[in-house]
Structure formats: structure tokens, C-alpha cells
């Protein structure tokens, strides 16, 4: 009976482990293969933006292949899709066949491309098209190293080849892939493998230089490597050295004001930032990213994709932004060809929506997305593998959202209010709508409601402005009572101080507790008493360590949202315990161990007491910070920064004096002990980490043995 009972337990445990393994495997497959749907980026208490599901701004309105479009079979893969100024869509294949599509994405016309003499023109490996109108079209004939311009009849009216210029290196290959033209008639040509930026051609076809090349991001390590090579290698060895080149632009788009937008596809596993740029006339990136605290940072340091992406063979599969479009309202559309995701950003780099993703044949996902084209609230995506086009149309929700955001960016808060309210009714978690409503209510003078929406939308600036207005109103209404209360408090404090001095009133009778507070004002005397008069208290030190942890948790949880990154989903009390109490204990053990070797006089108990007493300024700062965070109107307050610096300095001074006294060290010897203590702390952490790995492997081994035994 007992053996049967144990056998049942064994099989139940085996079944549980098997189910956990299967569930985790299925979950990982689903996460890797499922389409992303529509999402945006939002804040949830963390410093970084996170992907958040949202209502669809764009929805699939049509999915058609070449057969459905009425295009004859036998063509090569789709190379590009584009629109002209009239909203017509054009399709280019890699074998140089050009098709004009009507509003229903049916074949309206095929251009029979001929030379200027009327002879059929052979085009191979074409990769880009720029239709200005149905009678003026540019084609990037990549493999033939030329750009041709044709009229409505398909006849070539102009041909641009590699310019004869001293600005162009001898080994430069003129292989055009993408084309754009500004309002002045200047033609921008991107060439495959060119790191010099776009080639500029005047309206008459004359080469006028390069424009807007990416730059190589340097670092101290690359600088040292370059200097080392210069000192140790001869010319022959340097010739074989790998040179870091800037990433090339994959696509470009020009808006109505002739600003050039580019996208840069990443080709390695480095962290991706600045994939999208907005270039000024002199080629400088002027695109910026607005942050919740009101600051605007260079978008060159902003990741326009996702913070974390898939890994294959322990290597991160980076996102590849290979196609970009802009519209008349300043919105930016970018295609990530790696994951098939389309991103829509406003002029301040706020993500409006992202959609697509995944692999497959169903509507809304792609096998090999090649290019996107925008025209009149429609976004077409060409898939070169399926030879298909997916058309996304702006939804009513999306139209309202983008209209409201455009009005907010132009400071038309009153006009945007009703639209933002409509957005909130359909998507109550949309933070853009919350920020827009916060600005609208602030403009109306409803500061309380403005603060509520600003807090929900993580709009630090509007919240601070509304808080300042609310505080000013409160002070104006209650100035007399506030003044009388202040006078009463100050008077009571003065009277109590005088009476306490006369009558020698002692508030704290315990000498060891009084000594604790004297460590900040009289550290040498206090720590001498701890060392030579045994006035230190292990109980007080332990209580301070616990208080250090508790106040740190309070500060993280209860501080104003502008000053904390607390999130119930991501914050960990255990991590905070390690960062506070764990740090105190780790430092105490490491310093004691080091100082024993350096003939220090302090005992472990004394080191722990000194370290714990040194946390008093931090404990006070945590409480003061929590209180002031709800009063300070500026999210970048110099007052809080100053208090933080002062608390850190006081902690350092108390710790320095305390350790010098108990170990009887000179200052130089103390500095040496601190450096060795830091090394010892790292060593202890490494040992703990290794023990954790060994225990994890031991557990895996025991589970494997159990499974093998159970199956037998």
C-alpha cells in the first residue's frame, strides 16, 4: 500500500514537470510566431517605453497578388511600390516592368519602356521608382548603373549615369536603389553600398555633391585601438585592418517643406539607435524625441524600434528599417523588414501606432516586405516573396487620433479636446490622449483634472505646471492662515528651545541613541566613543539597516510619479533589500576582511556599526525626498539634486571618519583599503554567483536523474 502511494506521487511529480516543460515550450513558440497586432509605446513607471496593445489606427482593406491586380504572369519579384502627387500607385518589378494601378489596385496601364529612339530598353535588377506624375517617372536601373526618366508613353527623356567628378572615388559603383526629388527639382539618388550619403543632381542633371552621410559613432575603445594600430603596425598591416564604415541609408523621403527623412538598416548585433533621421538643408539630423520630463533629446540616440527583440543562436536579430514615407501632416511611416512591422511616428518621434509583424500568408503579415508607399490615408506594403500588395486604410479611430495629435502639436488644445475624448472612449489606456486632454484642461484652467490626466499619461511638464497653479491658488486663498501658522510654529520652537536650555531638558535620555545623532555633527568624537568607550550599539545598527531598507521602499513606492520609476509589475522588494541592507552587510564583511590583512584594529561588529550609522543621512534624505516630490513643481528640480548630493557627501564623510578611527588608519591607508574593499566586494559577488550557478546545475541534474528513474 505504501509503495503504491509513493508510486502515485512519483508519477504526479513527473507529470507536473513534463507539463511545465511543454507549456513553456509552446509559449515560447507562440511568442516567436504570433503576429504583433496593433500596439504603441507607453510608460508604466519604468524609465524606458514599453510596447502596449492599442486599437487599430490602420486596418487591412485589401490583400491582392499580381493575379488579382490583373498583371500578366511571368514577372520577376516586386522591387518597389510608390505613389505620385495625385495619389496613384505604381508597381515596379526587378526586371524593369512598370505598372500603374487604379484606386481598386487593378492594372490601369503598363508602361512599355523604350529608349529615346523608340527602341525597347532592357532593364535588369531595377530596385527603385519615383513617380512625380503619370507623365514623369524616374526608375533606378540598378544593375545597369543608371537612372532613367520616362514620360507617359514610356520613352526615356533623360539618363543619368556615374558623374565624372573629383568628389567621387575611383572605386565608387553607381548602383542607384532609391530616388527622391524636392520642390526645386533637385534629384536625390541613393546607391547600394555607398556610405557617402545621397548623390545630388540639379534639375538639369548636373552632379552637385553628396548629401547627409551617416557618421561613425566613436568610443574610447575604438580611439585607443586606432592609436595602437598607428604605433604598432606598418602600412601593409594597416591595409588589412578592418575599417569601421558608417551604415548606409536604405531609403529616403522628402516632405512638403523639402526636409529629407532617411532610414538606416542595421547590419550587425549592436544596439540600434537613430534609425530614422530628419535632415536639414546642410545634412544635419534635426529630428528630436520629446521625453515626459519636457526635455527634447537628439533622436540619434533614440531607438525607433523595440527595446528587446528575438534571439537566434544566441545572437540578437536586429530590426532593419528599409523603407520610409512621410505625409502632408508630418507623420513618418517606417518599415522594419526583419519583423514586418510598420511604425508611424509624429514630428516629435512619439509612436502613434505600430502594426503588422509575424510571418505568413494571412492579411496583415508578410513573408518578405520590400517597400511601403503612402497616399491619401492608404498605406501599401509590397511583399517581394509573395508578389503581393497589402493595403492598410486609416480607421475612423485612427483618423480622430492623428487629427487630435496634429492639433495638440500645433497648440490647438481647445480644438483637440473633443477628439481626444473620443479616442479615450475607444481606448482608455491611450497615453497620447491623456497627455492631450491634460494640455486641453490646463488651457481651460481646470488644473485638478489636468493633473489627473497628466499623471495617467506621464506628462511631467503639464502636471508640474498644473501643480504650480494649484499651489498658487491655495496660497492666495489661505495666505493669512498660512502666515499665522508659520508664526505660531516658529514662536513655539523658539520658546521651547529657550526653556529647554534653562531647565536642561533632555529629549533623548539614552546615551547611545544621542551618540547616533552626534555622528553627523561630531563624527570624530562620536566614533572615538564607539571605539574606546564601547558606546556603539549593534541593535541600533541593525535597526538603522532595516530603516534604510524601509525608507528606500517608501521612497520608491510613495514618491511622486515624476521622480520614481516604481511599477508593481517590474519593481522588486527583494532587489531593494539587496541594494540597501545587502549592500551594508556586503561592505561590512569585505572591509573587515581587507582591513584584517592590512592590520586594521576594527572588529567586524565595529565596522558594521560604522557602516550602518553612515546611512542616517540617506534615511533622512529618503523621507524628505518622498515628501518634497509631491510639492516641487519642476521635474528637474535642483533642490532635490542638491539634497541628494548633500546626503551622499555626508554619508561619505561619516563613513570615512568612522573607518579611519576604528581601524586607526591614516587617510592614504584608508583610501587603499577602500579600493581593496571594492575589489573584495566584487569577488564575493562573483563567488555567490558561481555558487548559484552550481546549485542550479545540481538541481537540473537531480531533476534529470529523477525523470530517468521515473521512466524506468
Predicted region positions:
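Eukaryotic scaffold repeat domains enriched in small/polar residues
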Residues: 31-436, 457
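TPR alpha-solenoid repeat register
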Residues: 433, 466-467
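TPR/TPR-like (Sel1-like) alpha-helical repeat modules
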Residues: 438-464
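Juxtamembrane/start-of-transmembrane alpha-helix segments at the extracytoplasmic/lumenal side
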Residues: 468-487
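Alpha-helical transmembrane segments
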Residues: 488-503
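Selected alpha-helical membrane-embedding segments in polytopic membrane proteins
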Residues: 506-605
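Membrane-helix interface segments in multi-pass membrane proteins
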Residues: 552-580, 625-648, 685-712
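Hydrophobic alpha-helical transmembrane segments and adjacent short intramembrane/lumenal linkers
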Residues: 587-690
